[in-house]
Amino acid sequence: MAGFTLLPSRLLAFPSRALPRRLHHHHAKLILRCKMSSSSSSLTQSITLPSQPNEPVLVSATAGISSSDFRDAIDSSLFRNWLRNLESESGILADGSMTLKQVLIQGVDMFGKRIGFLKFKADIFDKETGQKVPGIVFARGPAVAVLILLESDGETYAVLTEQVRVPTGKIVLELPAGMLDDDKGDFVGTAVREVEEEIGIKLKKEDMVDLTAFLDPSTGYRIFPSPGGCDEEMSVFLYRGQVEKETIRQLQGKETGLREHGEFIKVRLIPYRELWRKTADAKVLMSIGLYEMAQREGLVSSQRLKPNS
């Protein structure tokens, strides 16, 4: 197929597709003004939020958290984005019926020089009843996942990764996915990079369709995979392409990933018609739902791709 090249360095170049343009939506920016004062005797900070100016929030650290990790945690985009979400239009503190009393920083995991994961406990109370709502938070920030569909000889294949997932104790079959490295919000750029690292396919940004951009504005155009305990918000992208059967054969079982980062990945291709029953990965099942409904609404094409189109 013209325009398709299999590179020895594990990169594949896919031709451009005239898929529907990705919708561009952005979160409204909330200017957060915090007044902080530190205590020399313990790791504490007093934060004043705009929504409750007369009720300072005490932020403290559990035993074992260093002063530098405590400061980095408070200054991190993970923590500040969580505070912004509290005061956003649909935030917990928006209507004044609840109040944030204190936050206890319990764990900080560094990814190089930046905070990758943050664990804390927030004490938020309903003002009318005085009852505290569950507030254990595992903060990891925004992420992306990509549904890659490759058509070949009348069959459509989904491209998945097979990875070691220590939290589950299992090897999991899942969509290519990854976290944003910073708070600049380049979701589509991160999606393209993750596909290249995990699958060995080089895509173009303009060929990606943001399936989460079709959601209602009240969602913020993101999906929360586990809102009961984690702040992660995810964008799900779609890529469709047509390839030769030989490409399917070469991708199947291919070993990829950044070994120096502990990524031991195998590429698995599954017929799309069987995808919904082949894995318990929530990202896969979410992407199927988004893709199928977007097709039903005419937001993405349901027609098969033609060679050289």
Swiss-Prot record:
Q: What is its EC number?
A: 3.6.1.21
Tell me the domain of life. Eukaryota
User: Which cofactors are required for activity?
Assistant: Mg(2+); Mn(2+)
Q: Where in the cell is it found?
A: Plastid, Chloroplast
Pfam families listed in its UniProt record: NUDIX
Q: Which residues form the Nudix hydrolase domain?
A: 139-292
Sorted alphabetically, which keywords does the UniProt record give? Chloroplast, Hydrolase, Magnesium, Manganese, Metal-binding, Plastid, Transit peptide
Report the GO terms under cellular component: chloroplast; chloroplast stroma
Q: Name one GO molecular function term.
A: ADP-ribose pyrophosphohydrolase activity
Question: Which PROSITE patterns is this protein grouped with?
Answer: NUDIX
Family affiliation: Belongs to the Nudix hydrolase family.
Subunit-level organization: Homodimer.
Function (record text): Mediates the hydrolysis of some nucleoside diphosphate derivatives. Can use ADP-glucose, ADP-mannose and ADP-ribose as substrates. Regulates the intracellular ADP-glucose levels linked to starch biosynthesis.
Specify the protein name.
Nudix hydrolase 14, chloroplastic
Its lineage opens with: Eukaryota, Viridiplantae, Streptophyta, Embryophyta, Tracheophyta
What is the name of the gene encoding this protein? NUDT14
